[in-house]
Amino acid sequence: MLSTPPKLPSAHGPVHFPRRSGTGMNRMARSATAVKTLAGLSFKRERAVLKSGMAPVAGADEAGRGPLAGPVVAAAVILDPKRIPAGLDDSKKLTATRREALFDEICATAEVSVVMAPPSRIDRDNIRQATLWALANAVKGLPEDPRLVFVDGNDRPPLECEVEMVIGGDGLIASIAAASIVAKVTRDRLMVGLGAAFPGYGFERHMGYGTAEHGAALRRLGPCRHHRTSFAPVRAQQLVLFETEMLEIEAEPLVDALV
């Protein structure tokens, strides 16, 4: 694990992870031959974009659509074609140790922007709209405006630049893979922090997903302010707690009469 955790993203604006070394992206060579071929990933589309002179090109992805608690985190990355970290892949296919190492390397060599949509926005807008908002603002927060953005999935975020949706893109496109790693590591670290701040839920283990442990904690403790109350399992526990409280209130006069 990295010795220094990243600054956590704000719901109000992007967080940048500036490269610690190397020349600016505007000055780097855009040659397609500068792109490395890494095992497990295809760079045909990125090569074509770079060869056409359509640069910079970015990748965007999110982490945390499905959990019952915590934010959805979106990341956008512009990779340096000459310094692509070796071994990039879908973050879900990597070990935690490998993700952490790649996170450090990506932040040191690429332009990175991260935005989170907190549970309050998810509950207000719905998870789809909150995710699209986070993805769009992560891209807008990059130091350079990309000419083209590769985005994982098939749901296009509202962006003025050209967007290419790629289903399974985090296992196909290097910049999407990098974004998926940044988003997941950032979110996992945040959930570990929430686990310490809200003991008993086990956030540091299940990262907010609907595991058996999490379900038991919800039944025992009820939801906290980091739960997504618009999600059915959380809403159901809220209803149970409300009904229990109402029964207790109704029973109070009877208890007083018996005392």
Curated annotation (Swiss-Prot):
Question: InterPro entries, per this entry?
Answer: RNase_HII, RNase_HII/HIII, RNase_HII/HIII_dom, RNaseH-like_sf, RNaseH_sf
Tell me where in this chain the RNase H type-2 domain is found. Answer: 55-243
Among PROSITE patterns, the record links this protein to: RNASE_H_2
Q: Which residues bind a divalent metal cation?
A: 61-62, 152
Instruction: Alphabetically list the UniProt keywords.
Output: Cytoplasm, Endonuclease, Hydrolase, Manganese, Metal-binding, Nuclease
**EC supergroup of this enzyme:** hydrolase
- CC annotations in GO: cytoplasm; ribonuclease H2 complex
- Kindly state what the record says about how the cofactor is bound: Manganese or magnesium. Binds 1 divalent metal ion per monomer in the absence of substrate. May bind a second metal ion after substrate binding.
What this protein catalyses is: Endonucleolytic cleavage to 5'-phosphomonoester
Subcellular localization, as worded in the UniProt entry: Cytoplasm
Q: Which GO terms describe its molecular function?
A: manganese ion binding; RNA binding; RNA-DNA hybrid ribonuclease activity
Q: Name one GO biological process term.
A: mismatch repair
Tell me its cofactors.
Answer: Mn(2+); Mg(2+)
Q: What is its EC number?
A: 3.1.26.4
Chain residue ranges for the region called Disordered:
1-26
- Pfam families, per this entry? RNase_HII (PF01351)
**Keyword field contains Nuclease:** yes
Keyword Hydrolase: yes or no? yes
What is the documented function of this protein? Endonuclease that specifically degrades the RNA of RNA-DNA hybrids.
Q: What is the similarity comment for this entry?
A: Belongs to the RNase HII family.
The name on file for this protein is Ribonuclease HII
The organism is Azorhizobium caulinodans (strain ATCC 43989 / DSM 5975 / JCM 20966 / LMG 6465 / NBRC 14845 / NCIMB 13405 / ORS 571)
